[in-house]
């Protein structure tokens, strides 16, 4: 379910799964690089090539680790989004039953003429419903922050690995 409040859990999950699939493919290639490096070490005389392969392995390890961490974070985020979206749907039912509207994650009174009784009903229900909406907004914010942190850490780790790789290739 896609909505303007929480986002699209399906797309997040799909991207997370794709990143984790790429990790598996990279790790399969890693075995080939390890075998080549070991053969060259045994045969001797190719120290520069072995050093380059070792550097490539370190880069590959970093990329695979960060892809897997990012994919895992996105899939966790997708699960959280789906749960929050369902909670928002249930909250919306309660809000409507109280004669109110949910605008994003704000519980508001709709426009129109109303009776004193309905106004009092809305006035009594609104604070509790807004607290529920606020808890959902807080949960959504925490999930977004946790996911963004993993992505930022991954970006920094990949940038450092790329710099180290470029430095090695310039020697």
Language model regions located:
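N-terminal secretion-targeting helices of virulence/extracellular proteins
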Residues: 1-171
């Amino acid at each position: 379910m896609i909505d303007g409040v929480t986002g699209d859990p399906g797309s997040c999950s799909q991207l997370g799964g794709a990143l984790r699939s790429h990790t598996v493919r990279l790790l399969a290639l890693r075995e080939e690089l390890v075998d080549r490096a070991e053969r060259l070490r045994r045969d001797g005389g190719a120290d520069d090539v072995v050093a380059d392969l070792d550097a490539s392995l370190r880069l590959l390890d970093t990329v695979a680790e960060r892809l897997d961490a990012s994919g895992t974070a996105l899939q966790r985020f997708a699960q959280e989004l789906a749960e929050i979206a369902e909670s928002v749907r249930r909250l919306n039912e309660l809000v409507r039953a109280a004669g109110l509207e949910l605008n994003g994650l704000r519980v508001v009174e709709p426009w129109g003429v109303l009776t004193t009784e309905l106004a009092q009903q809305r006035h009594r229900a609104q604070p509790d419903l807004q607290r529920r909406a606020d808890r959902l907004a807080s949960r959504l914010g925490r999930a977004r922050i946790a996911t963004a942190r993993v992505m930022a850490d991954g970006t920094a780790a990949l940038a450092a690995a790329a710099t180290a790789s470029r430095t090695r290739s310039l020697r």
